[in-house]
């Protein structure tokens, strides 16, 4: 696939989260300025905990989302899985992008979490729930995320996902340097 993608290509996003969908749309249109895309969000399981608590579990969640999106929708040109997780006192996300022939992956920047947030995570479902409780917000995970709260809106969940997605798209934007890695 070259940078001059002409036909409309369907991008299946393994999430209905608006922050994730916005990031995927932004990354694809930035990476392929001449491309035409249709973006479709699907609700598929990650098959990991609601709040993954390690790098490997988070990565597996993103891979599983792509696999499950492919099983759900066979009509995609690209499949995108994003999974946010925590390892120790930092949060981050893994992004996985697959076509029928290639896979690209990248981990986002890491963000330190306050000690009181880490302590409360032991008794909560997800980081977003704890952030809402500690910061008095509502549904922050579908808005700017923990990162927007802790950076005074200098960064958002979507902006950090955008960077990781651009990096995961490298095999697709430079196909002459990346042979097919999926069979």
Swiss-Prot record:
InterPro entries documented for this protein: ITPase-like_fam, Non_canon_purine_NTPase, NTPase/PRRC1, YjjX_NTPase
Which Pfam families does this one have? Answer: NTPase_I-T
For this chain's record, the cofactor binding note is:
Binds 1 divalent metal cation per subunit; can use either Mg(2+) or Mn(2+).
- Binding site residues for substrate: 75-76
Q: What S-S linkages are listed for this chain?
A: none
What cofactor does this chain's UniProt record say it requires? Answer: Mg(2+); Mn(2+)
Catalyzed reaction equations: XTP + H2O = XDP + phosphate + H(+); ITP + H2O = IDP + phosphate + H(+)
Its top-level enzyme class, in one word, is: hydrolase
Sorted alphabetically, the keyword list is: Hydrolase, Magnesium, Manganese, Metal-binding, Nucleotide metabolism, Nucleotide-binding
Entry's Gene Ontology molecular function annotations: ITPase activity; metal ion binding; nucleotide binding; ribonucleoside triphosphate phosphatase activity
Kindly indicate whether the keyword Manganese belongs to this entry: yes
Q: What is its EC number?
A: 3.6.1.73
What family does this chain come from, according to its entry? Belongs to the YjjX NTPase family.
Per its database record, what is this protein's job?
Phosphatase that hydrolyzes non-canonical purine nucleotides such as XTP and ITP to their respective diphosphate derivatives. Probably excludes non-canonical purines from DNA/RNA precursor pool, thus preventing their incorporation into DNA/RNA and avoiding chromosomal lesions.
What name has this protein been given in UniProt? Inosine/xanthosine triphosphatase
- High-level lineage: Bacteria, Pseudomonadati, Pseudomonadota, Gammaproteobacteria, Vibrionales
């Amino acid at each position: 696939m070259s940078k001059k993608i002409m036909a409309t290509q369907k991008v299946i996003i393994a999430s209905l989260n608006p922050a994730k969908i916005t990031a995927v749309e932004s990354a694809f249109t930035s990476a392929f300025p001449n491309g035409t895309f249709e973006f479709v969000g699907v609700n598929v399981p990650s098959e990991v905990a609601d709040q993954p608590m390690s790098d490997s579990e988070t990565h597996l969640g993103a891979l599983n989302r792509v696999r499950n999106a492919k099983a759900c929708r066979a009509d995609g040109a690209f499949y995108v899985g994003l999974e946010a997780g925590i390892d120790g006192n930092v949060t981050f996300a893994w992004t996985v992008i697959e076509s029928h022939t290639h896979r690209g992956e990248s981990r986002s920047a890491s963000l330190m979490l306050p000690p009181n947030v880490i302590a409360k995570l032991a008794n909560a479902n997800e980081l977003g729930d704890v952030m809402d409780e500690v910061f008095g917000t509502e549904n922050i995970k579908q808005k700017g995320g923990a990162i927007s709260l802790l950076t005074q809106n200098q960064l958002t969940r979507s902006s950090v996902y955008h960077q990781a997605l651009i990096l995961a798209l490298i095999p697709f934007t430079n196909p002459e340097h990346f042979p097919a890695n999926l069979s």
